[in-house]
């Protein structure tokens, strides 16, 4: 059984794949925060800006088999005859709590490339085409290799230099979205700090949440 909070067609907004047409499949549940505001202060990830609780989002639901979820994802891709390889991003919450070999096989059989955005606390299964790891605080990092490491910045417990020796092709810093957590004047500080770090340490590239700028999901 796969529990999906929401699934929708959009443009990838973050990281190296920003701007790419994608079906987003957001799994319900996370291992670093319950998703309830009353638990945020004690969570390992306290800055999450995503609703991943339940299955009541757009095109959300429970799917009994990998094939059923793959069919659901396929129906959300609106351009089957354009000669472009369709792309699905599994995210959460924490997608590796649910993503398994059966679903990877079913989605590949439907013709999709598979991207995953994970907090890295669980080992990724084989068969993922693009793996983005986004470490959170002092949570133990198990997945130490992939295509991109995207670090929300600044995090007191997760300084960028801690990750520079890991086996990733791309290292990105993304300013923490504090719109719901800080007064307006303080919201500019994460962006300024991130820009300054990228300029001082060219290994790191700036990643912005372009979907929020564009006003899309």
Summary of predicted features, one role per range:
Residues 1-24, 194-196, 202:
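Short, Lys/Arg-rich amphipathic segments at extreme N-termini
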Residues 17, 59-60, 183-186:
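Short, solvent-exposed loop/turn segments at secondary-structure boundaries
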Residues 2, 6-9, 21, 32-128:
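Conserved Radical SAM active-site core
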Residues 19-21, 42, 146, 168:
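A structure-centric signal for secondary-structure junctions around beta-strands
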Residues 27:
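Aromatic-flanked redox-active Cys/Sec active sites in thiol-based oxidoreductases
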């Amino acid at each position: 059984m796969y529990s999906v909070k929401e699934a929708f067609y959009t443009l990838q907004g973050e990281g190296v794949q920003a701007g790419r047409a994608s079906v987003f499949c957001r799994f319900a549940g996370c291992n670093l925060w319950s998703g309830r505001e009353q638990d945020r202060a004690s969570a390992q990830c306290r800055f999450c800006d995503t609703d991943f609780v339940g299955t009541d989002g757009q095109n959300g639901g429970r799917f009994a088999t990998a094939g059923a979820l793959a069919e659901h994802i396929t129906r959300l891709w609106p351009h089957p005859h354009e000669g472009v390889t369709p792309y699905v991003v599994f995210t959460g919450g924490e997608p590796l709590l649910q993503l398994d070999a059966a679903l990877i096989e079913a989605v590949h059989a439907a013709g999709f490339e598979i991207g995953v955005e994970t907090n890295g606390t669980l080992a990724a299964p084989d068969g993922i085409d693009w793996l983005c790891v986004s470490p959170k605080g002092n949570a133990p990092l198990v997945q130490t290799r992939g295509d991109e490491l995207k670090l929300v910045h600044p995090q007191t417990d997760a300084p960028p230099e801690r990750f520079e020796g890991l086996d990733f092709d791309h290292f990105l810093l993304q300013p923490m979205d504090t719109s719901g957590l800080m007064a307006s004047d303080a919201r500019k500080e994460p962006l300024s700090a991130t820009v300054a770090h990228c300029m001082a340490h060219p290994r790191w590239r700036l990643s912005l949440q372009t979907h929020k700028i564009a006003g899309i999901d």
